UniProtKB/Swiss-Prot annotation:
HAMAP family xrefs: MshC (MF_01697)
Cofactor binding note from Swiss-Prot or TrEMBL: Binds 1 zinc ion per subunit.
Any GO MF annotation of the entry: cysteine-glucosaminylinositol ligase activity
Residue window of motif 'KMSKS' region: 301-305
GO cellular component: cytosol
Alphabetical list of Pfam families matching this protein: tRNA-synt_1e
Keyword list, A-Z: ATP-binding, Ligase, Metal-binding, Nucleotide-binding, Zinc
Keyword Nucleus recorded: no
Biological source species: Renibacterium salmoninarum (strain ATCC 33209 / DSM 20767 / JCM 11484 / NBRC 15589 / NCIMB 2235)
UniProt family annotation: Belongs to the class-I aminoacyl-tRNA synthetase family. MshC subfamily.
InterPro entries: Cys-tRNA/MSH_ligase, Mycothiol_ligase_MshC, Rossmann-like_a/b/a_fold, tRNA-synt_1_cat_dom
Name of the molecule in the record: L-cysteine:1D-myo-inositol 2-amino-2-deoxy-alpha-D-glucopyranoside ligase
EC assignment: 6.3.1.13
Length: 423
């Protein structure tokens, strides 16, 4: 599946040093090793209402991470999936009386356009769940053979969370992930997990399961539903969590550097994905788990189910500059929960205009300090609000020399390369 186009990244003098990123599994701020190669997996959309501001905030958060890595001199291998077959997609298509394939393709294309407009660096691999079925089927068969999965009387296949859990005394030392057990990534107790699991696509009360928290691996064909060849599994379609695990294992090292997504994916999605990976090859899925906060509207979480969405495409259709939208998102720390407001957008429009105007009266020698301050802020857990304030302070300084086109160019390049804002 094609991704989207990416602007060439401006090259800056020097490099960012010692970036740190909060790890959701250890609940600590951890250093990101500055290596020649970095690997990132960010869970993608289910294409039936793209792209709302919550989506955009997540992908901008990890776009910042990719920019920080690249500024450190690393080569970034970035993979993102698309859940192009799932119950919510089928339900929306049925509700609207459209073919689910057409709905998915239209929303994926809209998402691509939104990401291009927001200047989000495209993944090297953009993989649909349907495309990945050819790799998912043998993985599920292997889990059954190893005793980590089981068939229901219906033919559906589930992951056995109890069989796969192996807790060792020192497996979580210093935030390092070792053998998997349920709760290792999220830190939740089984009692805390149950309502969250039910809310986020799980079926804890289904009769015949060995354990209430066992997630679906393979759903056998039902009348009126699409299905694909599943070899010994029978025709059907994959469960949600196994899709990302298999795609990540196909295109990234084991374990890869950072698993990213919204905070609502911490459990069950990332918890179960890591369990699948451990059961398949006794290696953690990722070294580091990072999660973006939730975005609300008028004090409520923005979500498709609630219908309280602010869509990037709708703002673009109204003529809003996508860079003002990007600045609105970056004004909030990526891990914080925040609300979209009209006032926030208006402040961002003004900020963007002021930044652009400042490029016409830039003092000689002023840009190097700005570059340093942006780098320092982003190295500290992607602190975009502090980076934006650094630019504001630089913009607010009165020019003390004749205009320097070189400094203006360096400042503009830094703002684009590090913050993704095109002036």
């Amino acid at each position: 599946m094609k991704s989207w186009s990416t602007r060439p990244l401006p090259q800056l003098p020097g490099n960012i040093e010692a970036p740190q990123l909060f790890d959701s599994a250890s609940k600590t701020l951890r250093a990101l090793p500055v290596a020649a190669d970095a690997s990132l997996y960010v869970c993608g959309i289910t294409p039936y209402d793209a792209t709302h501001m919550g989506h955009a905030a997540t992908y901008l958060a990890f776009d910042l991470l990719g920019r920080v890595w690249r500024d450190s001199g690393a080569s970034v291998n970035y993979v993102q999936n698309v859940t192009d077959i799932d119950d919510p997609l089928l339900e929306r298509a049925d509700r609207d009386g459209v073919d689910w394939r057409e709905l998915a393709e239209s929303q994926i294309e809209l998402f691509r356009a939104d990401m291009t407009a927001l200047n989000v660096i495209a993944p090297q691999q953009y993989i649909g769940a349907i495309e990945a079925i050819q790799w998912i089927v043998p993985a599920v068969e292997e889990l059954i053979a190893e005793g980590f999965a089981y068939r229901m009387d219906s033919g559906d296949v589930y992951f056995d969370t109890v069989a796969a859990s192996v807790k060792t005394p020192d497996s979580s030392n210093a935030g390092e992930l070792g053998a998997w057990w349920l709760g290792q990534i999220s830190g939740l107790s089984p009692e805390e997990m149950l309502p969250v699991f039910a809310e986020r696509g799980g079926d804890p009360e289904r009769d015949g399961k060995r354990n209430p928290l066992d997630p679906l691996l393979w759903r056998v064909e039902r009348a009126g539903e699409p299905a694909w060849p599943g070899a010994s599994l029978g025709d059907g379609r994959p469960g949600w969590h196994i899709e990302c695990t298999v795609i990540a294992r196909k295109f990234l090292p084991a374990p890869f550097s950072v698993q990213g997504g919204g905070s609502d994916l911490l459990f069950p999605h990332h918890e179960m994905g890591d369990g699948h990976a451990w059961a398949l090859d006794h290696t953690p899925l990722a070294k580091h788990y990072a999660h973006a906060g939730m975005v609300g509207l008028d004090g409520e979480k923005m979500s498709k189910s609630r219908g309280n969405l602010v869509l990037v495409s709708a703002l673009r259709a109204e003529g809003v500059d996508p860079m003002a939208v990007r600045l609105s998102i970056l004004a909030n720390h990526y891990r914080s929960d925040w609300s979209w407001t009209a006032e926030l957008l208006e402040r961002s429009k003004l900020r963007l205009a002021q930044w652009r105007a400042a490029m016409e009266h830039t003092s000689v020698g002023s840009a190097a300090q700005l570059v340093s301050e942006i780098r320092t802020a982003l190295a500290a857990d992607l602190d975009a609000p502090t980076a934006l304030n650094a630019v504001d302070n630089w913009v607010g300084q009165k020019a003390t020399t004749e205009h320097s086109a070189l400094d203006a160019a360096l400042a503009s390049d830094a703002i684009e390369a590090l913050l993704g804002v095109v002036l």
